[in-house]
């Protein structure tokens, strides 16, 4: 299977070569990689330009000025990379972050899963970060069964079936739900992990509750489901005020949704606590 790898990059001079070198050393080499330099003001562009001179499977696309925003912007940058190729030439589409170091057998293992199960729509390993002791530990932001945003891969047929990625906050959860909606399996390889050099969304921790409200809106939750989801998060984080911040953010949203009514219905059903109980009967 042939892989297309898109790497959005914004001011990644400290990590970009570590990422690219780890891909250049993959045991599975049937891939092309496009680095999309999203208006970097550091040495990212120069570093990648020098790298691609010696690595013909890699190419660079430069964009002009950028604004840094979680979620929506990275998807828009990703699509700039897709425009550079004909997807007819590829079987698997990947969106990788520029601050990831991949083990040499990463793509080989991903390819094996796709080949063995035609209904597998998304595959990844796990994401590890370095703790204060210098140890590499699991980045415990989500379930180990979730294909994380920094290391997304999609079977092309699945990518088309779910109409691609949505350029909104929460895109990296929406894609999983839409893959499930289209009857594709989601696989994570538990003994295959990558090194994440910079913890996810580290710049946005202070805005977590506000972003959660925006996310609930983006996935089409109605008011009762948003309240239940906000309450669960608030209880988990032991923060009474978080509930009100999240709901205020949810109620303030008014932009058009990027989901169809059919997709919204599926997601609401998926997240409905009562429906989950009924499904277990």
Per-segment meaning from a language model:
Residues 46-88:
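Conserved donor nucleotide-binding strand/loop of the catalytic core
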Residues 158-161, 168-197:
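A short, conserved alpha-helix in the catalytic core of glycosyltransferases
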Residues 89-101:
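Short beta-strand-to-loop acidic/aromatic patch adjacent to the donor-nucleotide binding site
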Residues 37-46, 65, 100:
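A conserved acidic beta->alpha catalytic loop
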Residues 21-30:
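Short, acidic, metal-binding catalytic loop of nucleotide-sugar glycosyltransferases
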Residues 208-281:
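Non-catalytic, C-terminal membrane-associated alpha-helical segments of glycosyltransferases
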Residues 148-163:
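Conserved nucleotide-sugar donor-binding
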């Amino acid at each position: 299977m042939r892989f297309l790898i898109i790497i959005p990059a914004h001011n990644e001079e400290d990590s970009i070569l570590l990422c690219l070198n780890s891909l250049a050393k993959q045991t599975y080499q049937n891939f092309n990689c496009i680095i999309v330099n999203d208006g970097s003001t550091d040495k990212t562009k120069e570093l990648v330009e020098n790298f691609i001179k010696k690595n013909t499977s890699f190419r660079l696309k430069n964009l002009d000025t950028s604004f840094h925003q979680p979620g929506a912007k990275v998807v828009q940058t990703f699509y700039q990379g897709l425009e550079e190729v004909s997807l007819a030439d590829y079987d698997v589409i990947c969106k990788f972050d520029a601050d990831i170091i991949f083990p040499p057998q990463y793509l080989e293992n991903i390819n094996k899963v796709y080949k063995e199960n035609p209904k597998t729509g998304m595959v990844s390993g796990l994401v590890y970060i370095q703790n204060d002791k210098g140890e590499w530990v699991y980045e415990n932001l989500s379930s180990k069964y979730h294909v994380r945003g920094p290391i997304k891969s999609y079977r092309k047929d699945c990518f088309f079936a779910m109409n691609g990625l949505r350029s909104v906050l929460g895109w990296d959860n929406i894609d999983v739900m839409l893959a499930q909606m289209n009857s594709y399996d989601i696989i994570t390889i538990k003994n295959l992990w990558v090194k994440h050099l910079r913890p996810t969304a580290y710049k946005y921790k202070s805005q977590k509750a506000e972003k959660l409200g925006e996310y609930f809106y983006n996935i089409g939750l109605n008011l009762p489901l948003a309240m239940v989801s906000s309450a669960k998060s608030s209880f988990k984080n032991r923060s009474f005020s978080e509930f009100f911040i999240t709901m205020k953010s949810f109620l303030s949203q008014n932009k058009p949704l990027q989901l169809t009514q059919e997709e919204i219905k599926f997601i609401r059903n998926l997240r409905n606590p009562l429906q989950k109980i009924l499904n277990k009967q």
